């Protein structure tokens, strides 16, 4: 078994859920975070990467409303950020979630990679592009993950091609683990 594969089989423990900056854990190791529209497959991807169920998958999108921190083998902090763009939250709740994520992204010096997940079957939506534009200052730490590779897409959009040309990116399927090892290698190399 490779070092990469064995690393991802090590234990991962839930640390805490934060709804404000003061609750973020103090850590001495690198941090990676995952963000994407509601129902993009973020929790499924996290579970596939770490070869165990650490992030809750739900049938109802838009349920993660706090920042969830996980400690992987005392070597890596894994952060599950709330999904964005879910229509069934109030404007007030959407604003609170947006502020929570904004505070996190602007304050975490330990953040080494931000994985932005986009549904490959739908392509990037305006809200995805707005999020990427907002995060322009950390562009060098962003990796775009196109999810749901196992599902049929109609055609690749111009927006998708532009993102693929401007960002490090991978297309994955959490369902059959296609592309997961490539993302694991990226994560392993930041340690």
Which sequence ranges carry the predicted segments?
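Structured catalytic cores of enzymes that bind and process phosphorylated ligands/cofactors
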Residues: 39-40, 46-47, 75, 113, ...
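Conserved nucleotide-binding/hydrolysis micro-motifs of P-loop NTPases
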Residues: 63, 76, 83-86, 121-123, ...
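Conserved nucleotide-sensing/catalytic segment adjacent to the nucleotide-binding pocket
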Residues: 73-111
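Glycine-rich, phosphate-binding/catalytic loops in enzymes
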Residues: 51-52, 63, 94-97, 131-135, ...
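Residue-level signal for inorganic ion chemistry
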Residues: 70, 147, 183
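Canonical P-loop GTPase G-domain recognition
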Residues: 7-22, 150-191
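Conserved G1/Walker A P-loop phosphate-binding module
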Residues: 1-88
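Conserved C-terminal guanine-recognition region of P-loop GTPase G domains, centered on the G4
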Residues: 100-168
